[in-house]
């Protein structure tokens, strides 16, 4: 009889299928030679793990509390990983520039796990982070599922969410939920960063047709039985009887867009948010090209976009 952890299919380095859930976690890496950032992988449940990043802490900075960001990567709900090298490098540079703790979520992907699995996984990760509030290092003796970096350095008065593309869509839906449900310990989300948020909103622009078709294809793959289809409230915040954006669960928001086919969609989302009566602070960043900060971080545009987002953290 096969053991429960047996590999039943292996096509290295791309696919490995096991009989039980498995996370290919890395050993902790301390003081990255390029950035000084430390990171480690932490499983928080049988379905979800996170990679936690800590900036270099000098002797005179010990005891200083740092902002906490929960990061959700993009790629159509069905591709990539929080552990992918380009996301990893991107987050390291962000951590260095922002001087913040980042918790990057490794969530389940479609089509193996249809939505709303990813939404639930990221909410679970956020609640896990919130569960550290008010703890000290003595709690680690009885709470093996808690992380000392978050306890020792995390400032829960400065908790942010951050996502790009479909990751930004997940963050948007978390903000809707956080406006209705409490986080553990009464923790509040201060702000959120939405880079190129992924929505299905009908526009009158012919330029948006291609992007809308592509977005619809990914949505159908990720959530084939979505109630309301393309007008599901999770993907179309402007739909009839849509979500109450007035209740967004944060007080500050940075929305980034670029001059591409999705720009009109983002503008309609921003308009809906402004008309909703949400009382928070809205900051809009308009750039020339997308994903330079991830795929070309050493270019001037990539650096400018990184600085723009990290300057939002305070």
UniProtKB/Swiss-Prot annotation:
InterPro entries documented for this protein = AB_hydrolase_3, AB_hydrolase_fold, Carboxylest/Gibb_receptor
* GO terms, biological process: alkaloid metabolic process
The UniProt record lists the EC number as 4.-.-.-
**Record has Lyase as a keyword:** yes
Record carries keyword Metal-binding: no
Q: What keywords are assigned to this protein?
A: Alkaloid metabolism, Lyase
SUPFAM superfamilies on file: alpha/beta-Hydrolases (SSF53474)
Q: Report the top EC class in one word.
A: lyase
The biological pathway it contributes to is:
Alkaloid biosynthesis
Under the GO molecular function aspect, what terms does this record hold? hydrolase activity; lyase activity
Positions annotated as active site in the UniProt record? 165, 260
Q: Per the Swiss-Prot or TrEMBL record, what residue ranges does the short sequence motif Involved in the stabilization of the negatively charged intermediate by the formation of the oxyanion hole cover? A: 73-75
Q: Which domain of life is it from?
A: Eukaryota
Role played: Component of the seco-iridoid and derivatives monoterpenoid indole alkaloids (MIAs, e.g. vincadifformine) biosynthesis pathway. Catalyzes the conversion of O-acetylstemmadenine (OAS) to vincadifformine. May also trigger the formation of additional unknown MIAs.
Family the entry assigns? Belongs to the 'GDXG' lipolytic enzyme family.
The protein, known as? Hydrolase 4
Give the originating organism: Catharanthus roseus (Madagascar periwinkle)
Name the gene: HL4
């Amino acid at each position: 009889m096969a053991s429960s952890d047996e590999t039943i299919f292996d096509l290295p380095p791309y696919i490995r299928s096991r009989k039980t859930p498995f996370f290919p976690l890395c050993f902790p890496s301390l003081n990255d030679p390029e950035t000084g950032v430390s990171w480690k992988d932490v499983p928080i449940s049988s379905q979800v793990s996170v990679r936690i990043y800590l900036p270099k802490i000098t002797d005179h900075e010990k005891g200083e509390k740092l902002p906490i960001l929960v990061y959700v990567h993009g790629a159509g709900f069905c591709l990539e990983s929080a552990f992918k090298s380009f996301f990893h490098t991107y987050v390291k540079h962000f951590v260095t520039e922002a001087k913040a703790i980042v918790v990057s979520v490794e969530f389940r992907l479609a089509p193996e796990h249809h939505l709303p699995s990813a939404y639930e996984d990221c909410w679970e990760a956020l609640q896990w982070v919130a569960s550290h509030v008010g703890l000290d290092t003595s709690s680690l003796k009885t709470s093996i599922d808690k992380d000392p970096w978050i306890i020792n350095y995390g400032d829960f008065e400065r908790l942010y969410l951050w996502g790009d593309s479909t990751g930004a869509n997940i963050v948007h839906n978390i903000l809707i939920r956080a406006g209705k449900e409490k986080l553990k310990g009464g923790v509040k989300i201060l702000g959120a960063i939405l880079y190129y948020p992924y929505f299905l909103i009908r526009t009158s622009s012919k330029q948006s047709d291609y992007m809308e078709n592509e977005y619809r294809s990914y949505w159908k793959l990720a959530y084939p039985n979505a109630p309301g289809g393309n007008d599901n409230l999770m993907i179309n915040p402007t739909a009839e009887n849509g979500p109450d954006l007035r209740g967004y669960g944060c007080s500050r928001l940075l929305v980034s867009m670029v001059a591409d086919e999705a720009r009109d969609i983002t503008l309609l989302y921003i308009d809906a948010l402004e008309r909703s009566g949400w009382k928070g602070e809205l900051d809009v960043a308009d750039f020339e090209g997308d994903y330079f900060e991830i795929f070309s971080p050493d270019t001037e545009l990539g650096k400018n976009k990184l600085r723009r987002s990290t300057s939002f953290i305070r």
